[in-house]
Regions:
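Charged alpha-helical initiation segments
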Residues: 1-24, 168-182
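Amphipathic, well-ordered alpha-helical segments in soluble domains
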Residues: 3-10, 30, 37, 90, ...
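Short regulatory "switch" loops immediately downstream of catalytic or recognition motifs
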Residues: 7-13, 45-48, 98-107
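A generic secondary-structure boundary signal that marks alpha-helix termini
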Residues: 13, 36, 43-44, 149, ...
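Short, hydrophobic, well-ordered secondary-structure elements
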Residues: 21-44
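Short non-catalytic regulatory patches outside canonical folded cores
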Residues: 36-89, 96-97
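Charge-enriched, short contiguous segments at helix-coil
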Residues: 74-86, 90-171, 181-182
Length: 182
């Protein structure tokens, strides 16, 4: 999540459109990684035997099952999840090499130099990158943090024979520094 937030700050500071677009795209990719890691982190808190490599479930089913394991039902339709899903889908369109046809206006600046034409055309963003905006990244980061907090506030290990109010709290995914005190 820290990389996504850094990319957000860099894109806000950028005065050049291509740098802003680059940082937004990089931030969105890191956001998607963070969200996937968050769900795996929570899954392992309630299912210590969970093996990511052996899990062939699609993302939607994995997220739904993981949420159900800590007592949260019908969350995938909520606004925050839908915002994050949009970010995940955008990342997938980049990462999986989805085919896009991009149209844009092009007026040659020099009459005879084909090399310059090529450079100008190749610097145009393809469709999947044009759809990534600063707002999309910012909303995605905020939505992911709210999902993390919601799971932390409302989630518990369902299979224990203890009332939910007395269940031990799950650890925040985005609040973990990577260090653990023994």
């Amino acid at each position: 999540m820290m990389n996504a937030e850094t990319a957000l700050l860099l894109s806000r500071q950028s005065t050049d459109d291509s740098f802003r677009e680059y940082h937004c795209s990089a931030g969105l990719i890191f956001l998607a990684f963070a969200v996937e890691a968050m769900f795996i982190f929570y899954r392992r808190q309630v299912d210590s035997d969970y093996d990511k490599r052996g899990d062939k479930a699609c993302r939607k089913d994995f997220h739904k099952k993981t949420l159900e394991l800590y007592g949260i039902k019908n969350y995938l339709g909520r606004r925050d999840y839908q915002i994050v899903k949009t970010c995940l889908d955008a990342r997938d369109s980049i990462a999986h090499g989805d085919f896009f046809i991009s149209n844009f206006e092009f007026t040659p600046t020099v009459a005879d130099d084909h090399n310059i034409f090529s450079g100008e055309i190749l610097t145009q963003s393809s469709e999947q990158f044009r759809n990534i905006t600063l707002r999309m990244l910012e909303e995605g980061i905020n939505a992911a943090k709210r999902i993390d907090e919601y799971i932390y506030d409302n989630g518990y290990k369902v299979d224990e024979n203890i009332d939910s109010e007395f269940m031990p709290k799950l650890q925040l995914a985005f609040g973990v520094s990577g260090m653990y005190t023994w």
